[in-house]
Structure formats: C-alpha cells, structure tokens
Amino acid sequence: MTKILLLGLGRWGANHLRNLNNLPVELFVAEVGDKQLEPARKLGLSAQRLTTNYKNFIGKVDGVVIVTPAQTHFPLCKEFLEAGKDVFVEKPLTLANEESKVLAEIAAKHKRILQVGHILRFDPATLWLRDAVQNGEFGRVNMIRGHFGGFKRPRNDSGVMFADGIHFVDLFNFILGALPKSVTAIHHDFFGRGMDDVSFVSLEYDTPRGKTWATVETEYFIPGKFREVIICGDKLSAVCDYNVAQYKIKTYANTHTPAGGKDFKANEGVVTQIETPPEEPLLAELRAFIDSIKTRATPRADAQSGYDAVRVLNAALESVKTGRAVELK
C-alpha cells in the first residue's frame, strides 16, 4: 500500500485529511504542534503515524502532500524531491518564478512526480469545457470572464490573486491550451497589509482560432460566494458555476449576424443544461496523485503547469507596479 505523509492540517489541510483517509493509502500526518494533530486522532490514526517533526517520516513514505503556507512550498518541496519522494503541493507551486522553475528541474532530474493542487483541472465540468473549446463547439472564443470571490476571511500568506485568482488563471490556460501573451492587472489593498485584497487581471491569448480576451476578478468583500466562469464564443457561449455539485454548466447557442453596414442582429439560441458527474475534485486530484506514484504517469497538473501559473501571476504583479501591460516571457 502506498505510504503518504500529509504535511499541514489547517483549514484546507483538514479536507485533504478527510479525503486521504478514504483512499487506499497508509497515511501519516505531521503538524507543528501536538494540538493541531487532534483531527487526525479523531479519525483513528495511531500515535505511531502522527508527529510534530515531519523529518521523522521522510524515510518511511513514498510521497508527501504539502498543505502549508505558500512561503514554505519551495524549501519543503525541494527537501522531499531530493530525498527521492513524490510530491503533491497545494497551489501556488511557489511565489517566485525562479523557485518554481528550480523545483520542476529537480523533479525531472530525480525522476519524481511533482503535482500541483490546481483542483479545477479535476472537476468534470472543466473537462467538458476544455473538450468543447478544443473541439471547436464554441467556434472562436472571444472572451472568458471569471469571478472567484466573496466575503470570507483573507489569507495571510499571500494576496488574493495568488490565493484565489490562480485557480482561474490556470483554468483558462488549461481550457485554451495556451498561455497568455500579455498580462495587465490592477490591485487594491484596502486592509493595508501590503498585499492585494482585490485583484483584476486581464489576459490576452493567441489561439489557433484567434485572439481571446480573459479577465479574472478576485476579492474578499462582495457578499456571497462566487466561482463563476463565462465563456463567449462566436458559435456558443456557456456559464459555469463551480459552486454547484452536478449541473454546473448552461450553454447558450447565441450568435450575432451582420445586418448591413455596422449593424448586427442578436440571435438568441437554445439554452441547454449540461449534466456532469458529481465527483469531488479534491478526491479526484489526490487519487490521480496516488495513481501517478504507481504508474509514473505525468500528472494532469504537473510542475510545468504550476510554473506557468506562477509566471502569469508575477507578470500581473509587474503590471501593477508599472501600470503597463506585461508580455509573458
């Protein structure tokens, strides 16, 4: 049985614990303090599988799931990869471009799995959208809009763009099968913490079917919970609500046709509700990580995708500082 170390039992780490406990793995858990290990004890994990010093278990496990603050990702991933362990790390892979690049290189050198927690890649709705876009059902995708926000407690290890905006940045890269050529962003720091709590990111993609303009809005203030993506093509459009378990997607066969001169006619088409399997994405991505450990297959959310997302976000930070569009290097 595959031996997995879960490193971190914070808010999101507790969800990893619940899902890993339901998978066919021998689970070990590490946290900085004994009190933080209580959720693992309540699930029945023995004292021999719990520690406040993760180094005690490095030699005992096949892989590690790292759910710790973003600033710790680089040193922890590096340590485990160089120790010959496969690694799943929550997004972002790192906060700095160079660190993400180094981790990808270390994973390749040591022939280790490095999977990044880009969870939306494992949502059945995402796979439907990607396939429909790639198969041409939308025609030319003119624009994509994403809003990942709502009133909640802010994270303190990064701004809202790195905490939440990264979900839709990676999602758009995945759906379009491309990276943006140009990035523009505006941030606000209403809390005065020295990090963004409102973020607007504009991305310009070149795809085989033409240019696509995408926007990602994230914040901590608007009442409610928003996980919405809208894709507008010249043949088909779709609204996807990631808050919904099964019926996330509605498609609209809306088109515009020339009506002479500068006039266009707006044609409202059939609205279709798309049903996708009600699979929990976190469980799916953890299962995929365990499968990759066994088969050595490249993960769907591999080190390169993690590096690419970090590059886009750092281009956005540069745009915020300079007030200009930044070409992705």
Where do the protein language model's features map onto the residues?
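N-terminal Rossmann-like dinucleotide-binding module
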Residues: 1-45
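Beta-loop-alpha module in the N-terminal Rossmann-like domain of NAD(P)-dependent dehydrogenases
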Residues: 39, 48-106
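C-terminal helix-rich "cap/oligomerization" subdomain common to oxidoreductases
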Residues: 43, 56, 63-66, 112, ...
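A short helix->loop->beta-strand "cap" motif at the edges of active sites that frequently abuts
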Residues: 83-85, 110-112, 209-212
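A contiguous active-site-proximal alpha/beta segment in oxidoreductase catalytic domains
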Residues: 94-153
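Mid-domain beta-loop-alpha active-site segment that forms a flexible
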Residues: 117-124, 150-180, 196-197, 305-306
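C-terminal glycine/acidic-rich active-site capping loop/insertion
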Residues: 119, 234-304
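Contiguous beta-strand/loop segments that form the cofactor/metal-binding neighborhood of enzyme cores
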Residues: 163-248, 283-295
